[in-house]
A protein has these predicted regions:
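Long, amphipathic alpha-helical stalk/connector segments used for oligomerization, subunit docking
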Residues: 252-343
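FAD-binding beta-loop-beta segment adjacent to the flavin cofactor pocket
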Residues: 194-216, 220-221
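A glycine-rich phosphate-binding loop feature that marks nucleotide/adenosyl-phosphate handling sites
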Residues: 51-60, 189-197, 258-280, 377-389
Length: 416
């Protein structure tokens, strides 16, 4: 444990998508920095707004720790489909039918059918929910039933293989290396996965949190994307926050401290902070239970995906809140951390991350339960149109949900 003192601190630590265990996020990406700031006075905005990406390589086993994103550009030329006949889907799931043997008239190009004006280029949340609906109805195309086809046969016939190679060659190569399936001659399989956190630490127009001198930029703040990020706009936010805004606003803040000497770390405040961290780590290490941090992370991921994933409802969210509380209780009773306490210990670090994820999950569920409307990446089954699409309620919910930490085992306070 090391001490650092600073006149100002910038968090650029990414999102909290790995609360779902499986996501497209890097393995080292976690919500711990933002969460610890939240517990020390920085407010958290819109935690329930997370984006699910429609074009990811499907889950293919119990030992995966990460999902692979296939670029959304593939939907420019690929056509998304599942079989029209349930018996064909069952054969695909059993591995007894080649998708190339299904004639066009027996293929359901469901995005083109439902959204003729947009076809396969509908927004990410729409494409993701549509894929889930088809798979939930039994039309999934792999052995888990959790995949749909993204087919380039028609684009190759129309444009030629050379053009498709020029546009997507690196993506096709990556797909074949991972799946051992040639996407030039066979349709890709895709399925939605957690991708981006629109929620994050609340910041003002200067990118400062509610803790003076603490800034949050990029995905770890809530500021730019509302309820649903558009493709490539994370790059825009990185440029806006890190290049155009922060150098000026943090400079203005530091100008008032120009005469302040170097921050000393041998103070009672630093002593208390270090003791708090050490005590927490020692508590985790000394549980001496039977289950690994990964076990609890996977269990949390199942709860999140099932009840706080693409489609949410009050009953499921209330159930999730109860299940998360039960998981937290079990975590602090039956966690086992291997290795030495005083040495570099990846399992102990992981345990700390999972402890934070469990608390983040609770806040996400509270926020999703409070927002009884469908908006962007947040889809409530109680708030849909006659066609089954998202139905917003701007009269009652056109606000940023800003949550304030009130202490361990206490409900946070919502500011609108």
């Amino acid at each position: 444990i090391e001490r650092f003192g600073a006149h100002a601190v910038v968090l650029a630590t990414g999102g909290y998508g790995n609360v779902f265990f499986l996501s497209t996020n890097a393995m080292g990406c976690n919500g711990s920095a933002a969460w610890q700031a939240y517990k020390r006075g920085a407010m958290f905005g819109n935690p329930c707004f997370v984006q699910i990406h429609p074009t990811c390589i499907p889950v293919h086993g119990d030992q995966q720790s990460k999902l692979t994103l296939m670029s959304e550009s593939l939907r420019n030329d690929g056509r998304v489909w599942v079989p029209k006949k349930l018996e064909d889907a069952k054969k695909l799931q059993a591995g007894t039918l080649n998708p190339n043997d299904i004639p066009d008239e027996d293929r359901d190009f469901y995005l083109e059918r439902r959204y003729p004006a947009f076809g396969n280029l509908v927004p990410r949340d729409v494409a993701s929910r549509a894929a889930k609906e088809r798979c939930d109805a039994g039309f999934g195309v792999n052995n888990t039933g959790k995949a749909v086809f993204l087919d380039f046969k028609y684009a190759i016939d129309r444009l030629g293989r050379h053009t498709i190679e020029e546009r997507y060659g690196n993506l096709f190569q990556m797909y074949e290396k991972i799946t051992a399936v040639d996407p030039y001659n066979n349709p890709m399989m895709i399925y939605p996965a957690i991708h981006y956190s629109m929620g994050g630490l609340w910041v003002d127009y200067n990118l400062m949190t509610t803790i003076p001198g603490l800034y949050a930029i990029g995905e770890c703040n809530f500021s730019d994307h509302g309820a649903n990020r558009l493709g490539a706009s994370a790059l825009m936010q990185g440029l806006a926050d890190g290049y155009f805004i922060l150098p000026y606003t943090i400079g203005d803040y530091l100008a008032h401290d120009i005469q302040t000497p170097k921050i000393k770390t041998n103070t009672p405040e630093f002593d208390a902070a270090e003791k708090n961290v050490t005590d927490h780590l020692r508590r985790l290490y000394d549980i001496k239970g039977t289950k690994s941090p990964d076990h609890f992370h996977k269990m949390l991921g199942h709860i999140m995906w099932d009840y706080i994933g693409m489609a949410r409802e009050a009953e499921g969210l209330k159930k999730a809140i109860k299940m998360i509380a039960e998981l937290k209780e079990e975590f602090y009773k039956d966690l086992r951390v291997t290795g030495e306490f005083t040495a570099m210990n990846n399992e102990l670090e992981k345990a700390g991350r999972v402890a934070d994820f469990i608390d983040i999950a609770h806040l996400m569920a509270l926020d999703a339960l409070d927002r009884n409307e469908s908006c962007g990446g947040h889809f409530r089954l109680e708030s849909v149109t006659e066609e089954g699409e998202a139905k917003r309620d701007d009269e009652h919910y056109q606000y940023v949900s800003v949550w304030e930490y009130k202490g361990d085992n206490k409900e946070p306070e919502l500011h609108k």
